[in-house]
Amino acid sequence: MADQKILDKISKLLALSESDNPNEAAIALERAQKLMKEHSVTMTDVSLSAISEHNESIPTILKDGRLYTLLGDIISRSFGVTFLVISKHNNSRTAISGVCFIGPNDRIETAGYVFTVIARQLAIAKKNFLASYRSKLLEEMIEYFTSIGYIRDPETFRKTCTSLPKLYKSFFYIKSSCESRLRQATKAYLRGWLSSVSQKIDDFVYEEQETLLIEQYIQATYPHLRELRQHSVRFNREQMSHYHKGIKDADDNVNLFRGVTGDMHRRELGFKS
C-alpha cells in the first residue's frame, strides 16, 4: 500500500473533485487519478486510509478479563469503533497486554484516551472500596473471634490490631479465606461499577460504509484473529451485594458528558463527581 501521506493527498484531491467549481473539480480529479496510477493505489486503498488503529496498554486495575472487555465495549459503543485484545505469547503461556481500537482516524485516539480516563476512575473506586471493605472485614473477624472466646477483651484488641495483616499474625489460618473474599468482593464491585457506566452511554450511530471499512481493515490487517472466550460469572449473595454497591456508587458519583468538535464529531467522555 502507498505511503500514508500519498493516500491523504489523494483523499484531499478527491474531496476537492466534488467542488461546485467545475474547473477546480476537474483539476483535482485529474491530479488524484494521476497519483493513484503513479503509486498503484485503488479506491479501496484510499477508503481504507481513513481507518487506522490506536493501542492502549491494559492497566493493572483491568487485569481481570471481564473488566477490560466491559470497558472496551463501553468505548466501542460510544465512539463507533471496534476493539481487539492484544496478546503476547511466552513459551506455552498467553498474556493479555493491551487493547487495540480500530476505526476512523478522528475518533480512535480520543477513544484510547477515554479508555485510560475511565480506568483511572475505576482505580480510585477500587481503592476506596477496598479501604472500606477491609475495615468491615476486620471488624467482622474481631466480632467472630470474640463470640467464640478467642478474644476476651475486644476493645483492647482493637487498639493494637488495626489492620487485617496484623490480625493475620494472631490468626494466620484465616488469611487465605479473607484474601479470597477481598478479591471476589472487589471483582463484583468493579463489574457493577462498569455496568452502571455502560448504562450511561449513548450508542454511536454507525454509517454502513464505515462499518464495512472497519471490517475490511481488520480482515486485511489481522487475518488470523481468534475469539476470546470467557466463562459466565455467578455471584453469591454477598458478592451480589458488592456488585449492586458498585452500581450505586457509579450512579451517584459518575456523570458522563460529551463534547462535539466541528466536523470531526469528536466524542469525549468526562467525569463530574
Q: Where on the chain are the PLM-derived regions?
A:
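Extended, helix-rich structural scaffolds rather than catalytic motifs
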Residues: 3-4, 45-273
